[in-house]
Amino acid sequence: MGNCESRELVAQAKQNKIINTELDKAKKTDENIIKLLLLGAGESGKSTVLKQMKIIHNSGFSQEEISNKRNVVCANTVQAMGALLDGMKQLQFDFSTRVCNAHEKLIRETLNDKAEYGPFSDAMFNALTELWADKGVQCAYDKREFFYLHDSAKYFFDAIARVHTPNYVPTENDILHTRVPTMGVIEVNFTIKGKFFRVFDVGGQRSQRKKWIHCFDDAKAMIYVASLSEYDQVLLEDNTTNRMHESIQLFKQVINNKYFVNTSVILFLNKIDLFEEKIVTKKRSLGIAFESFSGPSQDLNAAVAFVEKKYRSMAENKEKNIYCHHTCATDTQQVQYVLDAVLDTILSTKLKGCGLY
């Protein structure tokens, strides 16, 4: 089950060695190279932002990359169903049809199998389809804030039939929704207006964070990606810590670190679409995470402004510029607009005095 993802992790490790060697050799004074650091807690969407940069500025994904993602799509779908079934058990919901007990057994066996995971078998297709249609599973999904479930779960469940077709090829949107934890460093390069950008995405899980700081003290700008929608969720690593609280504390550590005193900070408050759904449609007030939030509880603008203020307040230097954007990282058109504005900001002469270049 895990080999298709472990291959990606091995590839990441090899790439990480290459990048570290190049970093050691790079001339920090080269004015035509702009190094950008992409930071954020796990599952904030920063790797999705990097994929968007690859699509928008670096001619997208190769045929080999697209082909390799098919297994990742399948693995993510089965993993999401496994997590949903765990949540269902936690909430003590029952299946509405008996056949789903056999389907659950297949999901569990597949998740425990460490062999290569390929396209859905007919049995797996039937299991996923009928489980997703089950009323008990749907009830658990509606209560997903009480257990860990990846944001892209519904996207992949709704795509089960399409993914099961013999000639299925992952779309860019499919790839944007895939999830493989970033281990080490991933780099994307592109040139704009005569400047060579090197963008580095580093691991967001706790175990990866200590590797960030010393390697990137010469970064010209930092893009910190924070998920707005995680205010009612807990960390995958410990299942107790509020994810937004964790992200805010991480932002505090990074923005006040001595290595980044002269680094401009760009804050992406990401997943605003999911945030709006929770605040407006599901009526889950931000007060769940912050007792000081006075509302109005269903006011999206008030909630976003509160979170933005929380992040900004973490800077010890109150004069430090923090350029904030509200984003949906899976929306290529919107991300392109935001990235164009960000890169123009980085290149503008107005910010030369801030140590950009």
Curated annotation (Swiss-Prot):
G2 motif: annotated segments: 174-182
Region called G1 motif, residue ranges: 35-48
Cofactors required: Mg(2+)
UniProt-annotated stretches for the region G5 motif: 327-332
Function: Guanine nucleotide-binding proteins (G proteins) are involved as modulators or transducers in various transmembrane signaling systems.
Quaternary structure and interacting proteins, as annotated: G proteins are composed of 3 units; alpha, beta and gamma. The alpha chain contains the guanine nucleotide binding site.
Protein name according to UniProt: Guanine nucleotide-binding protein alpha-1 subunit
Gene transcribed to yield this protein: gpa-1
